[in-house]
């Protein structure tokens, strides 16, 4: 009885501190968020946390307390304060859930490390290979995957007249494309060729993301689940993908598999970096495998999701679809479509940017930790006064909130309207350029600053090349125009059930 009384007294004292004395006590937000992360955990596990974040900011304003020590911000002005190259805000322990264990030791990944200096060291040797100038050397690899993709759509859906879940097939395309540029071959027989999952990789990826997103809201849970030293209780591992990467590494280093020096892939680049590095740099075989895994596990989902969003919104807005078709027809682009030609298509560019804006790939907070000097959030309070967040506060912004800011994107920010990226009637050149720059600066679809997505240009490269190919070759229509797609937010906002009919398209003379 005495023990129970002690526990209740301690719990009451702890709750009283968080309600009356915690440094964040004056930050508005749900009542439960003052005491526990449970609501945050359950909401994220439900798979649509981005909607909750929008509602919370609509109700409470630009600064919202969503957990005892976690604050969500929505003012675009905060982007440069938290995420710029000059800002020294490390990632939070949310990302620690992404760590792996090797030999009982925790190993941080390029994506998950909370050490900005370590991240810069790990990223520096490889980042140049993700620039457009280097991607152009890989263009023929993406071309052959696109040709295979179009061929499979023709064979499996156009000729037999069967409906196609295009979200699923965009995922197959994205995985095969990233596999080809990484190690010159698809994984096993290839997702497009099989027309389905391989070794449960796609299923495993979904389950791992479900775990990462939810458990990351209460990172201490990961210590007793996935990182449990006695018995691991976590999502399925990516062992099949890791094994494939290891086999490719061994085959390439032993000479069992060779690659033309004039036709290099990412594995060639990674091995060259390892060979040229000083042993003190710590670039090992495990580092190379980690780089390969980062490519294939992080490089496919966002590409596939964006492609699905592009087609879905075009089919929901027939006028936009027709306008894009007319632009591409008039451009008379060669087949396969060169990247340099595609990015010069003005309306195509507007469509891609708008799809990324209304459906960013990541749907949770990009969490950071406030450094020792604290953070003054300008005009964060309802009365327009600044709000001070003390050191150690977990703070972040959600692209699904920021990308819909009406002050930046207009009063119709929640509407898919590619024309907002074009110069308006009567709009001066200088005003247009300033407006576009402002929108680009605020877009958080790929993150921002020093931790911006490494593969951003690679993803866009694959997107800009495939969209004009399929829009030019086929006519798409939704099987049910009234049906909404299925979304699940588990870090990446993945898409399912976008059923379309595909017909061959007769190009105008």
Predicted regions and their residues:
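C-terminal helix/juxtamembrane-tail motif
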Residues: 11, 491-509
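Cytochrome P450 heme-thiolate monooxygenase catalytic core
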Residues: 91-103, 137-307, 323
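Conserved cytochrome P450 K-helix/beta-meander segment immediately N-terminal to the heme-binding cysteine loop
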Residues: 397-433
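Cytochrome P450 I-helix active-site segment
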Residues: 32, 143, 197-204, 261-264, ...
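N-terminal membrane-proximal hinge/A-helix region immediately C-terminal to the signal-anchor transmembrane segment
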Residues: 2-108, 112-121, 140-152, 173, ...
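Cytochrome P450 fold signature focused on the C-terminal beta-domain
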Residues: 159, 252-269, 325-345, 358-387, ...
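Cytochrome P450 heme-binding "Cys pocket" and the immediately downstream C-terminal segment
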Residues: 28, 151, 187, 318-321, ...
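Short, small-residue alpha-helix embedded
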Residues: 302-315, 466
């Amino acid at each position: 009885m005495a023990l129970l009384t002690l526990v209740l007294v301690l719990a009451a004292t702890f709750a009283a501190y968080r309600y009356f004395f915690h440094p964040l006590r004056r930050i508005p937000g749900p009542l439960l968020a003052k005491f526990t992360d449970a609501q945050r955990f359950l909401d994220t596990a439900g798979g649509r946390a981005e909607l909750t974040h929008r509602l919370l900011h609509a109700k409470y304003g630009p600064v919202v307390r969503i957990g005892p020590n976690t604050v969500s911000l929505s003012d675009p002005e905060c982007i440069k304060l938290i995420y710029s190259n000059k800002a020294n805000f490390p990632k939070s322990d949310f990302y620690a859930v992404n760590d792996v264990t090797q030999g009982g030791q925790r190993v941080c990944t390029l994506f998950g490390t909370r050490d900005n200096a370590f991240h810069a060291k790990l990223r520096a040797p490889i980042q140049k290979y993700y620039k457009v100038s280097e991607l152009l050397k890989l263009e023929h690899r993406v071309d052959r995957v696109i040709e295979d993709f179009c061929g499979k759509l023709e064979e499996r859906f156009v000729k037999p007249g069967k409906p196609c879940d295009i979200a699923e097939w965009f995922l197959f395309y994205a995985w095969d494309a990233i596999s080809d540029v990484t190690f010159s071959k698809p994984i096993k027989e290839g997702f497009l060729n099989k027309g389905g999952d391989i070794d449960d990789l796609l299923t495993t990826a979904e389950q791992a993301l479900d775990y990462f997103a939810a458990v990351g809201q209460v990172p201490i849970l990961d210590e007793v689940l996935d990182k449990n030293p006695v018995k691991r209780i976590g999502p399925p591992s990516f062992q099949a993908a890791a094994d494939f990467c290891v086999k490719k590494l061994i085959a390439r280093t032993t000479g069992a598999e060779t690659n033309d020096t004039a036709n290099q892939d990412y594995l060639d680049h990674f091995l060259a970096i390892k060979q040229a590095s000083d042993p003190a740099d710590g670039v090992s075989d495990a580092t190379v495998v980690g780089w390969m895994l980062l490519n294939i596990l992080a490089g496919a989902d966002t590409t596939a999701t964006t492609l699905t969003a592009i087609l879905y919104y075009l089919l929901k807005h027939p006028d936009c679809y027709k306008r894009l078709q007319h632009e591409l027809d008039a451009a008379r682009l060669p087949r396969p479509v060169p990247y340099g030609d595609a990015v010069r298509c003005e309306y195509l560019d507007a469509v891609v940017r708008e799809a990324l804006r209304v459906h960013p790939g990541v749907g949770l907070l990009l969490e950071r930790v406030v450094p020792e000097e604290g953070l003054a959030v300008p005009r964060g309070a309802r009365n327009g006064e600044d709000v001070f967040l003390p050191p150690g506060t977990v703070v972040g912004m959600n692209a699904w909130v920021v990308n819909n800011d009406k002050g930046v994107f207009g009063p119709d920010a929640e509407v898919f309207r590619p024309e907002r990226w074009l110069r308006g009637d009567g709009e001066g050149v200088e005003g247009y350029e300033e407006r576009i720059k402002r929108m680009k600066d605020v877009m958080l679809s790929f993150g921002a600053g020093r931790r911006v997505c490494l593969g951003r240009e690679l993803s866009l490269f694959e997107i800009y090349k495939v969209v004009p190919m399929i829009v030019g070759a086929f006519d798409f229509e939704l099987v049910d125009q009234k049906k909404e797609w299925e979304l699940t937010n588990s870090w990446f906002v993945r898409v399912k059930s976008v059923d379309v009919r595909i017909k061959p398209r007769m190009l105008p003379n």
